[in-house]
Amino acid sequence: EMNNGGVVTRKATHAKLAFSSPLCFPQFSVLDPTKTYTLPPRQIANGLVDAFVHTMEQYLTYPVNALAQDRFAEGLLQTLVELAPRAMQEGAPDYDNRANLMWTATLALNGLIGAGVPQDWATHMIGHELTALYGIDHARTLAIVLPQVMQARREAKRAKLLQYAERVWGITEGSEDARIDAAIARTVAFFESVGVPTRLSAYQLG
């Protein structure tokens, strides 16, 4: 609730278009974790994935010596992975877990981690098209697209993929290509662990 973006969908034309403006930043925002208590597990999972991909698209580009921004992003990614199991548990929601999840998701898109660094929102742009055409939940399109973008752009993103592998997942053994493969696999496994499929075939597509 602290960002400056939005999306407009027009079902008649199968269009889903994003927009943002500095004028859309709120003067203040109120974040109440208890408002998440009535969300079904599917939407909690969607929130985890969306926040993860928001962070990745401001992080997984190329090195620009933005040391603090890199560490901010890596910390958010690790926090989401840490919070996910408890967030997805059945039973009464845990206030501290939801508070940390809400704050982490907020920091993933309020402009902090993207300040002064290159960004790549290709995953979101492709995901928007899948939602507009096939009605797949937004976050679920991202879980399908991000691993494929990581694979397709692995040479252009090699340095940051290796950094991501080491700092987020602790992957330090093997060749560079093996470490990148392992990092992509861990990303897929994380999405799948919260019940979010990573293949179009899960939606009878492709």
Where are these regions (language model features)?
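A glycine/threonine-rich phosphate-anchoring loop and its flanking beta-alpha core
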Residues: 1-68, 160-163
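Generic detector of intrinsically disordered, low-complexity, polar/charged segments
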Residues: 2-3, 105, 132, 192
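Active-site segments that bind and position negatively charged phosphate/pyrophosphate groups
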Residues: 58-185
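C-terminal hydrophobic structural anchor segments
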Residues: 174-206
